[in-house]
């Protein structure tokens, strides 16, 4: 079981910090629990292990590895990030599932009032849920290529190295709250060594 705290990048359904959630989950279950959310360095790994997790799960740190297939500009934006936001803007097929992202043109356009997104966009996202798993991949790929910050129907696909460049401004740049503490792109094997307590 993975206890994912609110600090995590990507889809975040709760509002409890990683360490607090880990404590609650461990008290409720008898199976091993892994911890995720906001862990980017050896100290973070050590903290969750000392709190009883059997392992740490690090998404954003490995997004910024040489082996990651994330779009190069997505990686660059992560390294330059000063903040993250919780939004429901990129929720086609994922209604009611806020996601933590780095701001881009789409978030600047549609999150002007500090909310998680306009109510009508969130309502449209709820309506798409039954269709999301039934839409053929070929249609989803075409939709991604046409996605623009000015169009309010924004899907959950992050920019990849083989995807359209436009997704860097119109797609979700998923990143954990502590992305601001990451300063380099390293080989995954080197990261594993550096993260091991």
Residue ranges of model-derived segments:
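Conserved beta-strand positions in the central sheet of alpha/beta enzyme cores
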Residues: 2-3, 57
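Conserved active-site-proximal phosphate/metal-binding subdomains
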Residues: 8-11, 16-34, 40-197
């Amino acid at each position: 079981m993975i206890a994912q705290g609110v600090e995590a990048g990507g889809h975040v359904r709760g509002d409890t910090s990683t360490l607090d959630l880990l404590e609650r989950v461990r008290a409720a279950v008898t199976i091993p629990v892994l911890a995720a959310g906001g862990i980017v360095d050896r100290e973070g790994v050590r903290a969750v292990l000392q709190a009883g997790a059997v392992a740490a799960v690090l998404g954003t740190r490995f997004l910024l590895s040489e082996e990651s297939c994330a779009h190069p500009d997505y990686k660059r934006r992560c390294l330059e990030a000063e903040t993250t936001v919780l939004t429901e803007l990129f929720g086609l097929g994922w209604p009611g599932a806020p996601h933590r992202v780095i701001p881009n043109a789409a978030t600047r356009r549609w999150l002007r009032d500090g909310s998680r997104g306009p109510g009508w966009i969130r309502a449209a996202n709820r309506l798409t849920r039954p269709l999301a798993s039934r839409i053929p991949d070929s249609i989803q790929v075409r939709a991604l290529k046409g996605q623009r910050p000015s169009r309010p129907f924004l899907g959950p696909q992050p920019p990849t190295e083989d995807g359209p460049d436009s997704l860097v401004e119109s797609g979700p740049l998923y990143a954990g709250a502590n992305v601001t503490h990451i300063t380099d792109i390293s080989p995954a094997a080197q990261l594993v060594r550096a993260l091991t307590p």
